[in-house]
């Protein structure tokens, strides 16, 4: 494995490293992120450990449960740029935007990146950062399953 993403939940930062042909690790990028906070209901702490990136996609859709005619269903309520799956239900993605947001919700969320734990499990990034990471993870990958890209080079995510 030559590609690593290390996420520090205490400092709300992330470092991306790649081993070169001389077996030296180089810092590719270092940035602020927002990780998950457990609220006991529907929000969870970002899982700690080592994970292999399973797949990526160009966007992340968010849903909310609604009850219609006594039946529970999921309705798409927002999206975010990029989606990198690193654990069961845990993703790295851009700033989430509600489909009904007519105010400054996106700017408020963006202003909190790197400050404190706030997401529902995922790792939030600035949009330009997640775009860069998505290209770096996928590099020349051509394996597609629906709208998911399967990285050809393994990428390990370490959450501490």
Where in this protein do the model-derived segments appear?
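Exported/periplasmic cell-wall-interacting domains
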Residues: 60-160
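Gly/Pro-biased beta-strand-loop elements
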Residues: 1-103
């Amino acid at each position: 494995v030559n590609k690593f993403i290390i996420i520090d939940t205490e400092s709300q930062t992330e470092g991306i490293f790649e081993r070169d042909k001389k077996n030296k690790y180089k810092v590719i990028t270092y940035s602020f992120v927002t990780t998950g906070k457990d609220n006991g209901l529907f929000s969870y702490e970002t899982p700690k450990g080592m994970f292999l990136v399973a797949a990526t996609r160009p966007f992340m859709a968010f849903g909310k449960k609604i009850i219609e005619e006594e039946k529970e269903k999921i309705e798409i309520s927002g999206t975010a740029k990029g989606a990198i799956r690193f654990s069961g239900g845990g993703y790295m993605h851009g700033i989430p935007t509600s489909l009904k947001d007519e105010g400054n919700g996106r700017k408020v969320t963006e202003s909190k990146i790197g400050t404190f734990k706030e997401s529902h499990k995922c790792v939030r990034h600035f949009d330009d950062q997640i775009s860069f990471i998505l290209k770096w993870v996928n590099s020349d990958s051509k394996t597609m399953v629906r709208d998911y890209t399967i990285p050809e080079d393994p990428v390990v995510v370490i959450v501490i």
